[in-house]
């Protein structure tokens, strides 16, 4: 399934997101920085993509780490999963945190993260005095694995 998403380049050298294969869920986002940026160990750098998106209503853009960058270089989004709402029209910026012990340099046009467009449901939150009982109840943090 495909959906048209309008993209505005905020600088002429910015890269439009690309899919690695025909059926990839995540599209690669690229560094739109004019120069290389080095992310020192234990620090976070905000990497501009040079693009803005018009995500259709009913969809959300979810920003995830690229597995190779996270596993091989230790770079991943600082907020774990970034959320791009459909009414946001500003530049997409990825906060990359270096979890490794080595500096990592991001060159212009390097792939830095991936975006997945997904449908979502908004809730009509309803305050109540009591919640319906379930077998699980209040058990959490691994409680279902103790039976």
Where are these regions (language model features)?
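DUTPase catalytic domain/fold
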Residues: 1-147
């Amino acid at each position: 399934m495909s959906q048209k998403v309008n993209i505005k380049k905020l600088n002429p050298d910015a890269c439009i997101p690309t899919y690695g294969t025909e059926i990839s869920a995540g599209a690669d986002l690229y560094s739109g920085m004019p120069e290389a940026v080095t992310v020192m160990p234990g620090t976070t750098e905000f990497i501009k993509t040079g693009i803005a998106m018009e995500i259709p209503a009913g969809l959300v853009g979810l920003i995830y780490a690229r597995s190779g960058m996270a596993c091989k270089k230790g770079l991943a989004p600082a907020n774990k999963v970034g959320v791009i709402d459909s009414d946001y029209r500003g530049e997409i910026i990825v906060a990359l945190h270096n979890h490794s012990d080595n500096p990592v340099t991001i060159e212009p046009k390097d792939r830095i993260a991936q975006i997945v467009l997904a449908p979502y449901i908004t809730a009509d939150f309803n305050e109540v005095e009591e919640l319906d009982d379930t077998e699980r109840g209040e058990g959490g943090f691994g409680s279902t694995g103790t039976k």
